[in-house]
Every structure is written in C-alpha cells, then in structure tokens.
Amino acid sequence: MSLKQQLESDFEGHKRWALRRQMGIPNNRRLWVCACMDERLPVDDALGIRGDRGDAHVFRNAGGLITDDAIRSAMLTCNFFGTEEIVIINHTECGMMSAQTDTIVKALKDKGIDLDNLQLDPDLPELTLKAGMFGKWVKMYQDVDETCARQVEYMRNHPLIPKHVTISGWIWEVETGHLRPPHFRIGEKVNTNKAMGAK
C-alpha cells in the first residue's frame, strides 16, 4: 500500500468515526452502561469493552443510580441510536452507603445552602425540589444488592425504554475486582462448611 493509499484509508476511518451519528452507526456493542463514578470501578475492564473505541455509551454518576438524567440518556440511546442492551453496575464500599440522608442534608444546611425549593434545571423551572424533598432526590442507599435489583426492574418497566432491550444489573466487588449478580456472593458459598455440603 502506498503512503497515499494509507492516508486515504486513515482519513476514511476518521471520517466514519466522526460522522457515525449522521451515518446512523450505533455504538459497536449496542450497549448503554450506567455505573458509579467511583474511580475504583474500571468499567471498560470489568465489561471487557473499549469505551474509547466506541463500544458503548457509558453514563456515570454518584452511585450508578437510575436518575431522571440517566433515564433521559438511556431513552435517547435505545430509541434513536440503536442500543439494544443496558447494563447497570453498582459496587461494594460505595460512598452512597457511607452516610445517612439526614447527615448529608444537615452538612449542606450547615454550609448555608438552602435546600428548599431548589431548582434542578433552569430550562425546566417545574423541576424544583420542594421543601423536604432533597433527601429523596440525593438517593443515599443502604444495600447495594437491593438497589441494583430494584433499578433493573425499574428500567425493565419504564415506558421510555423499549421492551426488546436486554437489561441486567451487576455488582462490582471492590474487594475482589470481579463482577457478580445481585444477591450472590461467591465467598458465602465456598467459605462455610454448610455451603460446602458438610454433614
């Protein structure tokens, strides 16, 4: 291949990458991921994907929670960008389990922040947290397994997510560096004599 041919080929690849939305090209795996923003959760490695190469749309927030903005993003990718699978990843030792909601509310109020009638979106003034609603909005939680399972069911039943989309939830174990389904801890299955079938 001549240098000219190589450069033309490279250009075509760059053009295809830059214009993939205009050309109707979905992400490579037709995948949308919602994961916690925690740096200990290596989404690409955990799922065996290359986000930097276009394998998935990855949405990250505190806790990997299905919020209104997560629904907005999932709705767009599933209905308009060809996405056919959703994976939700929560993780052990998540900061969203590290404090009670009341503690968060008090800490912010102690900083002088008014949490009553808090506007969430300047373009949608209707999206305002009324007095006492901030705690529900911030979504601190107690149990990572319950939270993950509940989010999967919520997405499966959401009217903006097409019914054909495959949806699963997983827990990243920070302590082992592996994914597992909610409510299944391998360590509990192999580390007791009862689990091992002792008589």
Curated annotation (Swiss-Prot):
Report the EC number(s), separated by commas if there are several: 3.13.1.5
Indicate yes or no for the key word Transmembrane.
Answer: no
Reported cofactor(s): Zn(2+)
Q: Which GO terms describe its molecular function?
A: carbonate dehydratase activity; hydrolase activity; zinc ion binding
Where does this protein act, in terms of pathway? Sulfur metabolism; hydrogen sulfide biosynthesis
Q: What class of enzyme is it?
A: hydrolase
Q: Which UniProt keywords apply?
A: Hydrolase, Metal-binding, Zinc
Q: Name one GO biological process term.
A: hydrogen sulfide biosynthetic process
> Is the Zinc keyword given for this protein?
yes
Assembly and partners?
Exists as both octamers and hexadecamers in solution. The hexadecameric homooligomer may form a catenane, through interactions of two interlocked octameric rings.
Q: What family name appears in the similarity comment?
A: Belongs to the beta-class carbonic anhydrase family.
Name-wise, this protein is Carbon disulfide hydrolase
Q: Which organism is it from?
A: Acidithiobacillus thiooxidans (Thiobacillus thiooxidans)
Q: What is the lineage of its organism?
A: Bacteria, Pseudomonadati, Pseudomonadota, Acidithiobacillia, Acidithiobacillales
